Amino acid sequence: MNWLQLADEVIAGKVISDDEALAILNSDDDDILKLMDGAFAIRKHYYGKKVKLNMIMNAKSGYCPEDCGYCSQSSKSTAPIEKYPFITKEEILAGAKRAFENKIGTYCIVASGRGPTRKDVNVVSEAVEEIKAKYGLKVCACLGLLKEEQAQQLKEAGVDRYNHNLNTSERHHSYITTTHTYEDRVNTVEVVKKHGISPCSGAIIGMKETKMDVVEIARALHQLDADSIPVNFLHAIDGTKLEGTQDLNPRYCLKVLALFRYMNPSKEIRISGGREVNLGFLQPFGLYAANSIFVGDYLTTEGQEANSDYRMLEDLGFEIELTQKQEEAFCS
């Protein structure tokens, strides 16, 4: 297949077929540079060479009643993670200050659990109001299944984006978790959209799904019209249902990122959890398809040193996208 020609067609408005999507995932490793060249043409058309940086604040760790097979915070997990209740507003603000100083444009407040309590939403809302005033960061909240009134409160507080991943295809969902449904996840994204918050929803690759499952989740996110799509690659943690699972290699991970770009050409594609473990030395190539990364640690696993990420972006000739307040602070 001529990947540059397909890229031009995508830029012109074509939506790729299932056969074309599978061709991306099944493409020969020898053609991977041509595939990524096409993905970069699409990425460059919409985002140039800018990269959005994101940072996670793990606001509540562990104690989750859900049985998600990939997650060390699940009630079914025996992984020896640090567990703590919802942190204070002051701790959230301290994290936002670090994000601002490290040129992170999007600050992600993430909490374990099925869904937030009224107190949790109040703490986040109060913190967000101050974050917007002091630092001007884009704020993404990820607090689980969300109710209408909670979404409205977060919107009024200034939350820009809400993350709730679909994680996998509808067909494969029951293999990953049984304590909530695929429809529960879709409904939360729809609630977020209804209340004017930008929807962020993505996938976890490497959970014993088929290639067709990967195509289906990429298309589902296209149909859901998620503005931001985090693509995670399973970092199998001992003590979870999926411990020992290692179905990925760096070349396949690049093909997955390319698929998400061809399928969702204008969206923010973020290389997320498992980037360092699964992409390895091919990490830089991922940014020819994606235009966003997490900097620093993830929820219960360590990420690459921030300085290594900054050096990687510099070596690639890419530019960090700053907020207006960061432009004023660092570029004046």
UniProtKB/Swiss-Prot annotation:
Membrane-spanning intervals of the chain: none
- By its UniProt entry, which Gene3D superfamilies does this protein fall under? Aldolase class I
Q: Which domain of life is it from?
A: Bacteria
One GO biological process term is: biotin biosynthetic process
Which InterPro entries does the entry link to?
Aldolase_TIM (IPR013785), BATS_dom (IPR010722), Biotin_synth/BioAB (IPR002684), Biotin_synthase (IPR024177), Elp3/MiaA/NifB-like_rSAM (IPR006638), rSAM (IPR007197)
Q: What SMART domains does the database record attribute to this sequence?
A: BATS, Elp3
Q: Where does the chain bind [4Fe-4S] cluster? A: C64, C68, C71
Query: Which cofactor does the UniProt annotation name?
Result: [4Fe-4S] cluster; [2Fe-2S] cluster
Which pathway, metabolic or otherwise, does it act in? Cofactor biosynthesis; biotin biosynthesis; biotin from 7,8-diaminononanoate: step 2/2
The answer to whether UniProt assigns keyword Manganese to this entry is no
Record Pfam families: BATS (PF06968), Radical_SAM (PF04055)
From the Swiss-Prot or TrEMBL record, what is one GO molecular function term? 4 iron, 4 sulfur cluster binding
Alphabetized SUPFAM superfamilies for the sequence: Radical SAM enzymes
EC number of this enzyme: 2.8.1.6
Q: How is the cofactor bound?
A: Binds 1 [4Fe-4S] cluster. The cluster is coordinated with 3 cysteines and an exchangeable S-adenosyl-L-methionine.
Oligomeric form and interacting partners: Homodimer.
**What is the protein named?**
Biotin synthase
The opening ranks of the lineage are: Bacteria, Bacillati, Bacillota, Bacilli, Bacillales
Encoding gene, per UniProt annotation: bioB
